[in-house]
Design a protein with these regions (language model features):
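A SAM-dependent methyltransferase catalytic signature shared across enzymes that methylate proteins
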Residues: 494-501, 585-590
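Short, aromatic/basic amphipathic alpha-helical patches
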Residues: 419, 484-498
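Membrane-embedded transmembrane-helix bundle of lipid-linked glycan/lipid transferases
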Residues: 1-384, 389-390, 395-396, 423, ...
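Extracytoplasmic/lumenal acceptor-recognition loop(s) of multi-pass membrane glycoenzymes
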Residues: 38, 191, 359-387, 400-474, ...
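Active-site-proximal, structured, solvent-exposed surfaces of multi-pass membrane proteins
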Residues: 429, 536-654
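Short Gly/Ser/Thr- and Asp/Glu-enriched loop/turn motifs at secondary-structure junctions
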Residues: 414, 504-507, 597-599
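Ordered hydrophobic segments in well-structured contexts
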Residues: 408, 474-476, 508-520, 572-574, ...
Length: 665
């Protein structure tokens, strides 16, 4: 049945498996696909990515799950990694109802109710009837909300994590009620897989584990400590990527990425309300329905995710960072709860129970049938991808590639997500900021688009200074009539007459910025500085030094960055590339010191020479290698211990009367 459910979902959404650009232009799907392409070409997780955000460690790009899988398969199959990412993400999105079916079968032992729930999840999104903002967001294409966010916004990793979530919950229950080690290992692998795929799904999984423990508190035979052991083992399996520094970086960046979230008094009240509500729901089930543990578990998750999501959509308040994104989890458990309500009422059919089931069912069908009917009959014409060559983003990217830039490009809007999915071109921006160790270049990029901190008449001059300081050679500006979705320049005409126009495509323009090299000599007082009392960094001396002689040349050679030229006394070599402790620089046979300026870029203390070459190489850092070694030991040990299933102890078996799931039948 699970395979049949997947087949139905795949046939209903066959357009998701086709190559090309999705009809929605605000999708960030190609931002994820660009990572798959990068890891296909540069598989080392401890390398350096020079193509985005003025450079960052490969490990800090994003969570690797789907992207590394697509990159690995691309070495085995004659398919582009970007398209393989699409196929993987679409497959996992269509598998969602199948894992819901398995989840329901496991916990209720009733296949037909499980099938009904899975089909309901396939065809119906209750969120459209509950949240006006979500209802307006679907436009002229009818898809379940989980698939619409995949198509419209590119939420492939979130859908993948959502698909794995029911399986992980089954595995966690199994390991807490059964002493066999292989169950614990399976649970740990699933937990690690979700944590390496999507942060939102990982946090949702942690919340579900909490509600599971709350549901079965004081239940004989359920060993919560095994849940904790599975979590620790999962971290050991995943710590090769989820290093302490990586987690800390994500944690500190997340509030800024989530529209400047702050834990203020309002958020604290809502969090206390969430905790209190969970206790109330659990006590209500304890007093009214003490035997219905599965229904209690689903109700707790429905309340928890619903609390976070509905406060955001109804009042505009974020209980957690990016509260709106938990709508997928809320809808999943809310729909399961709806079918669980009907299942329990009709388990022992009586007149009152039948009445209480039939009336809500009529209202449910009245709300669901129009959307389901439209979904089944709409066809694929409006959903089919279009050839990428027809999109304005690809035309601009291809033109940039033909210019063969030696410096960076400044690409904003949707182009910054898509550019590196097609071409290896260094850019100021990229796909996702969550892994950035320093964010000051983002401030400069925002200044270029908006001119917000410039004085009267200084907007263009300040923007050009910022571009040159970041090593930009070409900038793409989207006009007010551009087909690009994110037209984010406050004044798209600001560079007319100030920069050389290289190319114009419809209402999109490419300008050349004065550029010599990604390395130049500066005196100490010419370095990049940002005085505390100033809204903008001090850029003019740094940029003026670029035009002075002697000039340096720079180029990438494989994984090395080479700088050549005359090194003058009392001068530093300024390199507008993100500073990281994993960099090493050698001038000849001698290692030279790497400094950091106020914007987080590198400066090299070169030795005076009429002609010299500096070779910079990125070797990673000790923490990354130590955590990788630890993870390898955990993987080897975890599978070696399969030979000794009693190593972690044999805990009491299942709770009496519960069968393989929570529901008493």
């Amino acid at each position: 049945m699970a395979l049949a459910i997947f087949a139905i979902n795949a046939l209903l959404n066959i357009s998701l498996f086709r190559p090309g650009a999705m009809p929605y232009r605000d999708s960030i799907e190609l931002g994820y696909a660009a990572m798959a392409r990068f890891f296909y070409l540069h598989p080392s997780p401890w390398g350096w990515n020079p193509w985005q955000y003025c450079g960052l460690p490969s490990q800090f790009i994003y969570l690797p799950g789907l992207q590394y899988m697509a990159a690995t398969l691309a070495h085995l199959l004659p398919i582009e990694p970007t398209y393989l990412y699409r196929l993987l993400a679409a497959t996992l999105a269509c598998l969602g109802p199948s894992t819901v079916f398995l989840f329901m079968v496991y916990f209720t032992r009733q296949r037909w109710w499980a099938l009904a729930t899975a089909l309901g999840y396939t065809l119906f999104s209750p969120l459209y009837s509950m949240v006006a903002t979500i209802d307006r967001d679907r436009g002229n294409i009818q898809l379940p909300w989980r698939l619409l966010v995949f198509v419209k916004y590119g939420e492939g990793p979130h859908n993948a994590g959502l698909t794995l979530l029911p399986l992980a919950l089954v595995a966690v229950w199994e390991t807490c009620t059964n002493p066999k080690y292989w169950r614990l290992l399976l649970a740990a692998v699933l937990l690690a897989a979700i944590a390496l795929t999507n942060w939102i799904a990982a946090l949702a999984l942690a919340f579900c584990a909490l509600t599971m423990a709350l549901t079965v508190i004081q239940l004989p035979g359920f060993r919560v400590e095994r849940m904790a052991i599975a979590g620790l083992l999962a971290y050991g399996l995943a710590c090769f990527w989820l290093t302490p520094t990586f987690i800390r970086t994500i944690a500190f960046n997340w509030p800024a990425d989530a529209f400047n979230y702050h834990l203020q008094s309002q958020q604290q009240v809502l969090l206390w309300g969430l905790a209190g509500g969970l206790v109330v729901v659990r006590l209500a089930f304890k007093w009214l329905f003490p035997d219905e543990l599965f229904t209690c578990f689903v109700a707790l998750n429905t309340f928890g995710f619903g609390w976070v999501v509905l406060w955001f959509y109804q009042r505009g308040v974020n209980t957690l960072p990016e509260s709106r994104r938990y709508a997928l989890e809320f809808e999943l458990f809310f729909l399961i709860l709806i079918f669980e309500y009907f299942r329990l009422l009709l388990r022992r059919p009586r007149p009152v129970a039948i009445f209480c089931a039939v009336i809500p069912f009529v209202f449910l069908m009245q709300a669901a049938w129009p959307d389901a009917g439209r979904y089944l009959t709409q066809g694929f014409e409006r959903r089919n991808p279009v050839p990428r060559e027809q999109t304005i983003e690809y035309k601009l990217a291809a033109k940039l590639a033909s210019l063969k830039p030696q410096g960076r490009v400044y690409a904003s809007g949707g182009l910054r997500f898509r550019l590196n999915a097609w071409f290896e071109i260094a850019q100021v921006g990229g796909g996702f900021e969550s892994g950035l160790r320093h964010r000051l270049p983002l401030v400069l990029a925002y200044q270029v688009r908006t001119g917000v901190n410039s004085g009267p008449g200084q907007e263009t001059a300040d923007a050009i200074l910022a571009l040159r300081a970041m090593g930009v050679e070409y900038i793409v500006v989207h006009g007010t009539k551009s087909r690009e979705h994110y037209r984010d320049f406050t004044n798209p005409l600001k560079f007319e007459g100030a920069l050389e126009l290289v190319h114009r495509e419809e209402d999109d323009s490419i300008y050349r910025v004065p550029f010599h090299s990604l390395a130049h000599l500066v005196r100490w007082d010419e370095r990049l500085q940002w005085p505390r009392e100033s809204k903008l960094p001090l850029l003019r001396p740094y940029v003026a030094a670029m035009d002075a002689f002697p000039k340096l040349t720079s180029a990438w050679s494989g994984s090395e960055f080479r700088i050549s030229g005359a090194m003058e006394p009392d001068r530093l070599v300024a390199v507008p590339m993100s500073h990281d402790g994993g960099w090493r620089a050698k001038q000849g046979d001698q290692e030279i010191e790497i400094l950091k300026d106020d914007l987080g870029f590198m400066m090299l203390r070169a030795k005076p020479a009429r002609s010299a070459e500096i070779v910079m190489s990125y070797r990673g850092n000790a923490e990354a290698f130590a955590m990788a070694a630890l993870s390898l030991l955990v993987w080897l040990g975890a599978f070696a211990w399969l030979r000794w299933p009693g190593f972690l102890g044999r805990f009491p078996g299942r709770a009496r009367g519960l069968g393989p799931g929570m529901a008493k039948l």
